[in-house]
């Protein structure tokens, strides 16, 4: 019963949001919220997760709860008694709390800053470290310490262990049970010495865990349970400042960053066997994307991958500690090398000035040589949104000799906040003297290579497993020094077999130290000998020996195709009409076939036209006959109606004995009257006279009939 009840309760609780004030069902998916003491994240619905990400969770759901305090600087109300708002404030040294906005305005965190658990373990990325890089660079410049703030998504993340100093290892009591020693070193030695010491003390417990995707939320400090206890993942910066030398070399790992200059970078290369990590090329500009606005979700498609080398940023006018952060890159297309350069929309909205009208704003950029260029940054409205372009880039592309396929890299120079526009040629290959130190200091990587190369003296074979796109292409080619050639070992007989005598000349044979050689008066032909005895086709040999024609490279002399027999237009003698050469015969035959084809098409057209005309005539005849029949019926119908309705003499004369004799004579006037009704008005008088005569005759006949009847009686 207990197991069934526990299962039902767990299944029921899994359907609701973790927030007790919310009663929504989690039908499709859930979103992570704050971290629990066990190290897991709570599951929230979309509404609660959105409120938590915006920092308004307690303002919405915990208005009547206790534990509200005010910021000592601005007076903002902060809920101090809730785990959901633990990342919204910091503890002051003299007591009280302060919101993060006021804390960033008053002071910048130094290298000796020991953060509280509420500040570290529950801090979202967008709230804690949005503007710390600017304050950090300004505060450390006075102390002459080259240090950058911690990054949340750094490719090099150190895994430190919590030393269990008691029987209980709960996270709720860090002061008495365990202590986090992450950032405690002297200011004079700097952050690099501190990291080196921490690495030497804890070399058994750290490992590299890169985060390739910047869009996925990663906490600042991640707790993991392992065989050695609870492990703490503390981020380490990746950018190193430029030294005060006036010149700063551009490196292949980061744009204008000195590679392997800090102990952290050297240790990172040692951990990976001198080679780059698989995600190092994708996370070189992670620091720049942390400062982007929250609404822009940039994708790693246009992240700077591998920068270019052997270029100098000339900055001799002033000596300052500057850090160049790569932002994004764009591979030039055929249209980009013209008047304008199309920029990725997400990155243009995130890193470049915001535009309110289509005309745009002028944008000043600096090339790797220190020269400033002025472009026009604008956008075009389209159905799918805006299309951001840089206009006026033709002089820049022509000066640097950029072509389609090359890559332009947009970077930011801090703290001056200048925009740097670099480039990387697609056709430039790295030679062996400029190879990475990882290739020379990791011989075991060559043994694991999947590519087999011939080992010859003076040739350095590169590693077969490269981690970036440019290194993968370079690993497929051998790196050979200038002037070094592959040695080919051959015997005397094999070497003699590659030397052939010139045509139509017989070589003289000389014996030197029991070896027979052939002497040639002219330069021999170097090549593999052919088997002449195996071929018996003389025609094929004649075709091979014959030179090619200028009209068609693959055709030989004597070819009778239509391409080879014709002379070029306007060149060659004119032929008579009765000429019977191959060219004229071919042209006459083609002309005859063309005329026959044309006549056939003309006859087909005429036949089709005649058939169509006959069909139309037959249709017209049928239509005319149908109309005539309809007219005949229309004229005949009124006569039948008058005869049937107006004249019925048989009913009146049925009782008379002489009715049979008189019906015929009596019907005649009726027929005459019917006929007279259809006559024209001009003949009406004639018809009236005829009617009178008929009436007279009718009277006489009736009188005769009466007399006969009376006489019979």
From Swiss-Prot:
GO terms for biological process: leaf development. The keyword Translocase does not apply. Disruption phenotype: Variegated leaves. GO terms for cellular component: nucleus. Residues 676-688, 701-713 have a biased composition (Low complexity). Keywords: DNA-binding, Nucleus, Transcription, Transcription regulation. It is found in: Nucleus. Residues 464-477 have a biased composition (Basic residues). CDD domains: B3_DNA (cd10017). SMART domains: B3 (SM01019). Residues 459-478, 616-713 are annotated as: Disordered. Residues 616-629 have a biased composition (Polar residues). May be involved in plant development. This is B3 domain-containing transcription factor VAL3. The lineage of its organism: Eukaryota, Viridiplantae, Streptophyta, Embryophyta, Tracheophyta.
